[in-house]
UniProtKB/Swiss-Prot annotation:
Assembly information from the UniProt record: Homodimer.
Protein name listed in UniProt: Purple acid phosphatase 13
Gene of this entry: PAP13
Species of the source: Arabidopsis thaliana (Mouse-ear cress)
Position of the signal peptide: 1-25
Tissues/organs with expression: Expressed in stems, leaves, flowers and siliques.
Top-rank lineage group of the source organism: Eukaryota
Sequence positions that bind Zn(2+): H416
Disulphide-bonded residues: none
């Protein structure tokens, strides 16, 4: 089913609040559980994504002053009255361990800003901090070590809710300021205030498909973007720019199978792809608050110091301190009357872990009269029926699902699986009207589309043999868990699944109703293939704390 929106369009991202969607007659979670649907694969769709060439104009550093800001992005703080502005100045370096990095103190981190429609108001100045990071390889490849340009982070505070601001970033003392950009703050957190449109996309990469996704996202004028892991895909390249061919690599994300080869053991990445990605995404990230959720491709382990997530945690700003997690891997923030919780699939989550303890404390503190909607997001999906990913994150689910269920999380977004899937409300593999709706949006442009399901004919194992239909017994942090019987048909908790590249849009209408849509690359930007009203029932599903 392809659904056309009736839209009131505008020409600029800054006027996103004027864009509306008029919808009638779509199914609702109140109608559920809905019968499982598997959308047929489009015969004209190439399921393999091809990377854009390194010569793509959007990758190239602008020919300008050395310290002029680039790779500019806006991200939210915990509440409406604060945002972060991040950017890069200078050029990265590739060389030996003892090569001198750029000095962060050689250029200031300053943002000048004011309300968009108050022309006579003096600009305000905010200052921040700057860093550089290193990505180091084994001693034999030390000549390929990467040192970033200077990465700046500035927090703006005291902002008004739902207000358009204009800003420039850089160092005015060096005449090294960016052009003017715009962002809109989130509405104040009440049961009546929500951002008009929230885009959710995962596993973007830098492919021709990513170009289409980015263009469609911009045309839909979002107020907020949530990007789930799989950004630059720098880890799919060696440090010498050689692309790793993993298309025939039949192994899980832990690299436990014998044929994984260099795809999971090289210990190398090509870090300049992070710079390409920052430039490529700037038309979106410089104007629309964008929140990042780490996934597998952001781990990037460094062989000699065991450091992980260096690029991810250095390049973006997170409301970690404001939300009390003090970690870029998991944090929370408010977007009007919606409370978002970001978790990490690749760090410890058992009940004695820092992540679990923080999650429980964050859930306890939520005021549902101010933020009725609670949305959680992380990389590995708990409820995927695609072959190779069925129950892939089982140990994480076992440790955390009760928490999310008892505190009545409404929606969960995941990525990692290069396909789209939406569940009925579910808890512990059982249909439950108080369980979350789980949505996998891991087809943002990169990788190869998953087209086989665990229940497809030929994928169902012989029950007389000792066979696991789950590709992995663990997900890189905890011990394996016992598997269950493989399904012989699409599980009833799987409401809709489709192999297509695209992204999703969440529009929260009020404290009980939200509209979700899946937008495919092969369709026009205003068309949706899967649309449903997600309805909360707080009277029936009270918080069990």
């Amino acid at each position: 089913m392809v659904v056309k929106y009736t839209m009131s369009m505008s020409f600029f991202v800054i006027f996103a609040s004027t864009v509306t969607i008029i919808v009638h007659g779509f199914p609702s979670t109140l109608d559920g559980p809905l019968n499982p649907v598997t959308a047929p694969l489009d015969p004209n769709l190439n399921p393999i994504a091809f990377d854009l060439p390194e010569s793509d104009p959007s990758f190239v550093k602008p020919i300008s002053e050395f310290l002029l800001p680039e790779q500019i992005s806006v991200s939210l703080s915990y509440s409406f009255d604060s945002v972060w502005i991040s950017w890069v100045t200078g050029e990265y370096q590739i060389g030996e361990k003892d090569s001198a990095p750029l000095d962060p103190n050689c250029v200031q981190s300053i943002v000048q800003y004011r309300e968009f429609d108050v022309r006579r108001t003096r600009k305000q100045n905010a200052t921040g901090h700057s860093i550089v990071y290193n990505q180091q390889y084994s001693s034999e490849n030390g000549f390929m070590n990467y040192t970033s340009g200077i990465i700046h982070h500035v927090q703006l505070t005291g902002l008004k809710p739902n207000t358009l601001y204009r800003y420039q970033c850089g160092d005015p003392s060096l005449s090294a300021m960016s052009k003017e950009y715009y962002f809109r703050t989130m509405p104040k957190s009440t049961s009546e205030n929500y951002p008009h449109r929230i885009v959710v996309a995962g596993d973007l990469g830098l492919t021709y498909n990513t170009s289409t996704v980015l263009g469609h996202i911009l045309s839909n004028h979002p107020d907020l973007v949530v990007l789930l892991g799989g950004f630059s895909y720098a880890d799919t390249y060696l440090a010498n720019k050689t692309k790793l061919d993993c298309s025939s690599c039949h192994c899980d994300q832990n690299g436990t199978s014998s044929d994984c080869g260099s795809c999971y053991s090289s210990g190398e990445t090509y870090q300049p792809r992070w710079d390409y990605w920052g430039r490529f995404m700037e038309p979106l990230t410089a104007n629309v608050p964008t929140m990042m959720v780490a996934g597998e491709h952001e781990i990037e382990p460094q062989t000699e110091n065991n450091l992980t997530f260096a690029a991810y945690s250095s390049r973006f700003a997170f409301p970690s301190n404001e939300s009390g997690s003090f970690s870029p891997l998991y944090y929370s923030f408010n977007a009007g009357g919606a409370h978002f919780i970001v978790l990490n699939s690749y760090t410890l989550y058992d009940n004695s872990s820092d992540q679990y303890i923080w999650l429980e404390s964050d859930l306890i503190k939520i005021n549902r009269s101010e933020t009725p909607w609670v949305v959680a997001t992380w990389s590995l999906p708990w409820y995927s029926t695609f072959k190779g990913h069925y129950r892939e994150a089982e140990s994480m689910r076992i440790h955390l699902e009760d928490l999310l269920y008892n505190y009545r999380v409404d929606i969960v977004f995941n990525s990692h699986v290069d396909a789209y899937e939406r569940s009925n409300r579910v808890y512990n593999y059982t249909l439950d009207q108080c369980g979350p709706v789980y949505i996998t949006t891991g087809a943002g442009g990169a990788g190869k589309l998953e087209t086989q399901h665990v229940d497809d004919p030929g994928n169902i194992p012989d029950p007389s043999q000792n066979y696991s239909c789950r590709s992995s017994g663990l997900n890189s942090t905890l011990e394996p868990v016992k598997d269950e019987t493989c399904p012989v048909k699409q599980p009833e908790y799987s409401a809709y699944r489709e192999s297509s590249f695209g992204f999703g849009i969440l529009e929260v209408k009020n404290e009980t109703h939200a509209l979700w849509s899946w937008n495919r690359n092969q369709d026009l930007y205003y068309l949706a293939a899967d649309v449903i009203h997600i309805v909360r029932q707080p009277e029936m599903c009270s918080v069990c704390n």
